[in-house]
Amino acid sequence: KPLKQCNTGDYSNVFGSAGSTVLYDAVIESAKATQVYAENLAKERYLANAINVVITDGCDYSSTQGMNDVKKVFDKMIQDECLESLLTILIGVNIKEPHVKQELDTFHQKVGFTQFIAVEDASEKTLAKLADFISKSVSSQSQALGSGGASQSLTF
């Protein structure tokens, strides 16, 4: 049902945040799942492009793996050549603290994300714009299939 029709009281005490984001572990699991799916498609002789969009509201605080481990997984995805192209986008939402933006930008640079977007607020308008950006990015990546090259990065 639409968000405006949800009763916020139904969600009281359901979730408690404690700054325990496992960003690196989550990115690794997502990338590995993408890799496995690409390998399965390649075995069936399908060409595939992939897009991994990582959306976070903060820094990593409790992963068991680090930035270098994420980079290794990204590098392996490219080296294994199961994908014609890979587009990786890191999106920080509601990022108001400069140190958080800096840390996410460092993550983007060290790991090799294709693109990093820092969104300062999580307003309805901003999230709608973000959804449109992701939709266009997926479409662009899909249209690049068979071209031998990556899709064009879009501007948020």
What is the predicted role of each segment?
Residues 1-13, 98-110:
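Short beta-strand-loop
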Residues 9-48, 87-99, 125-129:
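Von Willebrand factor
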Residues 12, 71, 101, 105, ...:
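Generic detector of well-ordered alpha-helical segments enriched in charged/polar residues
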Residues 27-79:
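Exposed acidic/Ser/Thr-rich ligand/metal-binding surfaces
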Residues 33-52, 98-106, 140-156:
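A short, terminal or domain-edge coil/loop segment
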Residues 53, 89-91, 117:
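Hydrophobic/aromatic beta-strand patches that form the interior of the parallel beta-sheet core
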Residues 59-107:
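VWA/integrin I-like adhesion module and closely mimicked acidic/polar interface patches used
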Residues 109-154:
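C-terminal helix of von Willebrand factor
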